[in-house]
Amino acid sequence: MHNIKKENIDNIKSSTNQLYTLYNEADNWISNNLKFEEKDTAAYKVKNSRRIVRKIFKSLDSKPVFALFGASQVGKSYLIKNLLSINGAPLKISLGNENYDFLKEINPPGVGAESTGVVTRFTIDKVSNNPDYPIRIKLLDSKDLIIILCDSYFSDTSKIENYTSIDSFKKLAESLEEKYGAVNTETANLIQDDIFDIKDYFSKYFYKNTTIINNIEKSNYWLRIGDIISKVPSDEWHIVFSVLWNNNLFLTTVFKLLVAELNKVNFDNVVYANKDAVLRGFGEILDVQRLKELLADQKTISVVTKENTILNLNLSRLSALSAELTLTIPAETAETK
């Protein structure tokens, strides 16, 4: 594999950052100088290009990986063990100052059905400087939650009936504009680019629901919500987005619970957990059973943020919010593979 020099990566990051700034300036010019349909059309194009640049920028520091994905109970965990262990020995995971057998002490036991609910990354890098919290957990962000819940609704609903009307989308946007349009306080927890990422997901993956997608477009929901979303407090996001999953009460409840959990960590994208989070007989955060306990279980687990703040989070909700959990394997693995 050809390695790209850090200097080249830094140059690309600098260029994308400059381009992002230019798109912001273009967006401001459009807002101040164009009107009506011409303004909306130009704004869509600029905002869409800007959010693509932002996605590229955010991905530049990610390491290349090889990934395993497949059907349930076909031996993925054992394949990982065979790929990463040394001379057929058990695959050891470094958790603080101790090592643990991945298959026997961490990996969820198979019971004839899917057992793992969290993506696991293995690395030789030391991912935490705190031996008491050696596990790095990358969290889903607010936009990810919205997309996942929308996907759940559109993918798991056999027949969608009485979906939110164009008029309802328009009235919702109008009421939110009246309430938040003049607000000066803004946050970066959910921004305009995120709204256009959601819009793009609808276009790419819900294309079979052409009428619904077109009706949302006609209501100008995406553009109007994008203009004010950074002013809306997180405890009212469900008012903004529940219409997308047709006001399904269960999905809205899940959304509110998970957003509240993200709020506890100030919407950081990473937390660090102690070893009990993954060990069998303790937290077992990797086990898909945690997701089934989402609404009922009150068990908590200790995590530390990037600012070294120690918090207790709901275990099941942390599992649901985990985009990726990173475990450290022995450095000598790289020398033998």
Listing of model-derived features with the role each one plays in the protein:
Residues 74-76:
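Conserved glycine(s) of the Walker
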Residues 1-72, 86-336:
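N-terminal low-complexity/disordered regulatory or targeting extensions
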